Amino acid sequence: MKGGNLMKLTIVSPEGTLYEGTADAVSFPGLCGSFDVWPNHAPFNAALTNGTIRFRIGDTWQEQPIKGGFVTVRDDCLQVCAG
């Protein structure tokens, strides 16, 4: 999905897939504070703390509570392994 206005977001936990789809902005609960990811973001990995992942699809924000985990961002693909 590189170069587009949407990112592919996948959130999985031990219980299964919590969300799989697209988003145009995502906010994460990082260990050192919340942070946002937008399309064309530089690649990185980050640890997550207990909190809520917020993601926007068009004009609508959705929320997914998590119990920690980590996120990998690369080529507009965001993969979250949540606790």
Q: Each predicted region: which residue ranges?
A:
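Short, Lys/Arg-enriched N-terminal segments with co-localized hydrophobic residues
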Residues: 1-6
